[in-house]
UniProtKB/Swiss-Prot annotation:
HAMAP family: Trigger_factor_Tig. GO terms for molecular function: peptidyl-prolyl cis-trans isomerase activity. NCBIfam families: tig. It catalyses: [protein]-peptidylproline (omega=180) = [protein]-peptidylproline (omega=0). GO terms for cellular component: cytoplasm. Residues 164-249 form the PPIase FKBP-type domain. Disulfide bonds: none annotated. Its EC number is 5.2.1.8. It is an enzyme of class 5 (isomerase). This is Trigger factor.
Length: 437
């Protein structure tokens, strides 16, 4: 098998060969002889089936295996010619040509490799920014939020239920005049305006008085988790027993112990310092995500030029196109089915954004190496576990699902990006002036 292989640029290569179908047939017969020693076919002793019987039973599978062996050899030999290793390949090689004619299979294959990315002088593109300032008012407001969070509920003297109040009430729901499972409770406590109940329920309780009974008409969302209720009209019969409010306490020693469980000697000064740092970190995260990171990304993508691995780029275009599919109208989708040129043209609209995304992936990876930023396996597992806890899922199953579906590299890249930008904008501040707001 004569092979031609050459680099089209530093990140891509094209290889070609002509495979005689006779060589595939030879490989099929070779595999059939090996298979005959292992399989059991009715009418023959184990391992004694003739090759003809094996070919009759397994010809399609043997042909596929033979072609795969030959194609693997094609890839291996192409890499030798190119002076590349298998672990340098990005994505799966793609056959751009496959023509079978007159006993010859004419094959062309595209391969992509990690590009050479030079990031010399990237520091000069880091945008200037002002360190966010935290005011006393913001600290006091955040402390009040914590105090409100742990404050006990007490019976209120209020006579009319308002937004922000806690209602203690009985309710029973009906769909088509029939009660449904899980639609009834007594002495239930709900913060009005919290959005914990289906749309319309909490608003329907506003203005109720103690011991008042009221029918509240609502509609279950179309995507409601209980399929038998999704999209259905319902009536809830409600009786209000009590209006409750939270009584905010003082920031005394006992409260500080609750709010600072890991602190040996909690104090108001330490808590305020902790809150101040938390607010500053939140402001900094917002500044990074909304302003600094997009600005930095645009600049380095524009200024650092390198060859793009075409296979990875095409995969990213496909991914972005698939993600956008649900936003297209029925008319557009119908037109795409009829007009392939329109489909191709629409897909190409995602090319520029895909180029930026792929370039950023390599730039982030290279800059992270330069700054010695890494994501450990423990950090990766912890991030997946925390996501599972947040959504009430089994963390071990969630991790296994991510591993099986190949999502872990995506999570790892997101963590690497977060760590990198936090590092960049904590060490390379070009303007130490504070933000006056």
């Amino acid at each position: 098998m004569e092979i031609s292989a050459k680099l089209t640029n530093s990140a891509n290569a094209l290889a070609s060969t002509k495979i005689p179908t006779a060589s595939i047939n030879e490989k099929v017969n070779e595999l059939a002889k090996q298979t005959a020693k292992k399989v059991r076919i009715d009418g023959f002793r184990p391992g004694k089936a003739p090759v003809a019987a094996v070919l009759k039973r397994y010809k399609k599978e043997l042909e596929d295996d033979a072609k795969n062996d030959i194609f693997r050899n094609f890839v291996d030999e192409s890499l030798k010619i190119l002076g590349k290793e298998k672990n340098e390949i990005l994505g799966e090689p793609i056959f751009s040509k496959y023509e079978e004619k007159d006993g010859i299979i004419d094959v062309e294959m595209k391969m992509s490799f990690r590009p050479e990315v030079k990031i010399d002088g990237y520091e000069k593109f880091i945008p200037e920014f002002a360190t966010p300032r935290v005011t006393k008012k913001e600290i006091d407001e955040k402390i009040n939020e914590f105090l409100l969070m742990i404050a006990p509920l007490e019976k209120s003297d209020k006579e009319v239920l308002e937004k922000g109040d806690f209602a203690k009430f009985d309710f029973e729901g009906f769909v088509d005049d029939k009660p449904f499972d899980g639609g009834k409770a007594q002495d239930y406590v709900l913060e009005i305006g919290s959005g914990r109940f289906i749309p319309g329920f909490e608003d329907g309780m506003l203005g109720m008085k103690i011991d008042e009974e009221r029918d509240i008409k609502v509609k279950f969302p179309e995507n409601y988790q209980a399929e038998n209720l999704a999209g259905k009209d319902a009536i809830f019969k409600v009786k209000l027993h009590e209006i409750q409010c939270k009584k905010i306490g003082e920031l005394d020693d006992e409260t500080l112990k609750r709010l600072m469980p890991g602190e040996k000697e909690p104090s108001k000064e330490k808590f305020e310092a902790q809150i101040k740092e938390q607010i500053r970190a939140d402001k900094m995260a917002k500044l990074i995500n909304e302003e600094l990171k997009p600005k930095f990304a645009d600049i380095i993508v524009e200024n650092f030029i390198f060859d793009m691995p075409e296979i990875i780029l095409e995969q990213e275009i496909d991914l972005q196109f698939r993600n956008a599919w649900g936003t297209f109208s029925k008319e557009e989708i119908e037109n795409f089915r009829k007009d392939k040129d329109a489909l191709t043209k629409k897909r190409d609209e995602f090319r520029d954004e895909a180029v930026k995304s792929v370039k950023m992936t390599f730039l982030i990876d290279e800059i992270a190496k330069d700054r010695k930023i890494q994501v450990s396996d423990q950090e990766l597992v912890s991030a997946v576990y925390m996501e599972a806890y947040r959504y009430g899922m089994d963390p071990k199953k969630h991790l296994e699902e991510y591993r099986t579906n190949g999502y872990l590299p995506v999570v790892k890249m997101a963590l690497l990006e977060e760590k990198l930008f936090n590092d960049i904008f904590s060490k390379d501040k070009k303007s130490e002036k504070t933000e006056e707001k």
